[in-house]
Structure formats: structure tokens, C-alpha cells
Amino acid sequence: MRLDQRAQSDMRKIQLETDVNKHAEGSVLISVGDTRVLCTATVEEKVPPFLRGKRHGWINAEYAMLPRATAQRTGREAVRGKQTGRTMEIQRLISRALRSVVNLEKLGERTVWIDCDVLQADGGTRTAAITGGFLALVLAVDGLIQSGKLTDTPIKEGIAAVSVGKVGTELLLDLCYEEDAAADVDLNLVMTSSGKIVELQATGEEATFSRKEMLDMLELGEKGIEELLHAAEQSLGASWWYVGEEVEHK
């Protein structure tokens, strides 16, 4: 039995609150257990210089942790004037993941910024940011369609992310901080609603792992992805119709 009494294959409680920021074109507060991440989507009617005139959109993400997101205060990176390598890696991961399920030509010459701010960290912040960031993106696309700026959805399918790990001899789904810190093997899985893998990060922190363990961890992760996407569909309601659908604005 785990620290929080979950079974090995159990996700933590998933909570999704939409439209939590009145200024953003899309906003979601995602909670997975005690990890809480605020994700907002901002639409800019311009693209980076390398895409100008190409009738092609762009999606970019930024990620940050509030000073007291963790047990001990961590100073703001903006004050230090430099982002850590971890932050830059996570931002690139979120950006790649979201672009993988969007037809950027259909998005048009506009940029969608996804800002992910960790309010409270208890393991799995990057995976929660990907899932919450995608939902904020869907809400922003909903607004673009309702306003007539888009006539059909650029979103090809859903996407979510989850952590899996090996702690001792046990394979665990959705690790909390204590489990993550004790993990011998750490795996982050980003997967689409059709079961395609977008990103797989698997690292033997303190031990190696077998091919069978790798496949077993993937199976656990896929179960978690399905639960996250089901929760997302329930939370977004009618907006979920813009995920993987060719829709005409009427």
C-alpha cells in the first residue's frame, strides 16, 4: 500500500476547474492530488518572425513555480535573471507536446501562448502542466471559432501526460513527491487520445530496468492517460467537440 493508501495502478484525485481567469482566452486550474497548476492560454494575432507570411500558426509555452509551491521557498527565476535548465526543458516539452496535436496551418497566422504556473508541487508538475495546458488551448480555440476567427478546429486529437515510476520492486502510477524522490526509475509519458506516444522520458535514476518493466510502465501510463482524458471531456463539456472534429461555425 502506498503512502496515500492508493493501489499501484491508481491515479490521485483529478480536479479540473475551467475559466478561472477572466482575462485569458482559455484557463484551467488542474489539480492532481496535491499538485495544482494554473494554465492560461493567450491568443496573439501574430507569429514569430520565422513564420511571417507562411500562413502558419505557432504554440509556445512558459512554465514557472511560485516561490512557495514547494516545502521550502524557492526564489523567483525572474529575480535571478536566468531560467534553470529544468525550467527550459519543461517549457520545450510542453510546447512540443501541444504542437503535436494541432494543425498549425489551420490555426492561421497567430500564436497561442500557454502559461503554466505551479501553485503547489507534489510530484508530476510537468505532466499536469501538459494536460492542463491542452485544456486551456481547447477553450481558446472554442473562443476563436465562436468569434468567427476560425471556421474549423485545428486540434487533431486530445493529449494528456502522466508519470510512472519504479520504487523498490513496485511499479507505481502517478507518483507523489515522496514516491518520486525515492524512485529508482522515473518515466513521464505523453500520449494522444488515439494511443499514440508523443513523448517518452524514462530514466534509471538508481537502477536499470528491463524491457518487460518498460512495457508494464507504459501500460500503467496508458491507463492514467485514459482517466485524465475522460476527466477532461467531462470538464470541458461542449468545448470538447472541438477536439479532433471538423466543425463549421454557424
Curated annotation (Swiss-Prot):
The keyword Hydrolase does not apply. Phosphate binds at residues 86, 124-126. GO terms for biological process: rRNA catabolic process; rRNA processing; tRNA processing. One of its GO terms (molecular function) is tRNA binding. Its EC number is 2.7.7.56. The keyword Metal-binding does not apply. It is an enzyme of class 2 (transferase). Coiled coil: none annotated. Keywords: Nucleotidyltransferase, RNA-binding, rRNA processing, Transferase, tRNA processing, tRNA-binding. It catalyses: tRNA(n+1) + phosphate = tRNA(n) + a ribonucleoside 5'-diphosphate. It comes from the Bacteria. It holds the Pfam family RNase_PH. Belongs to the RNase PH family. NCBIfam families: RNasePH (TIGR01966). Homohexameric ring arranged as a trimer of dimers. Phosphorolytic 3'-5' exoribonuclease that plays an important role in tRNA 3'-end maturation. Removes nucleotide residues following the 3'-CCA terminus of tRNAs; can also add nucleotides to the ends of RNA molecules by using nucleoside diphosphates as substrates, but this may not be physiologically important. Probably plays a role in initiation of 16S rRNA degradation (leading to ribosome degradation) during starvation. This is Ribonuclease PH.
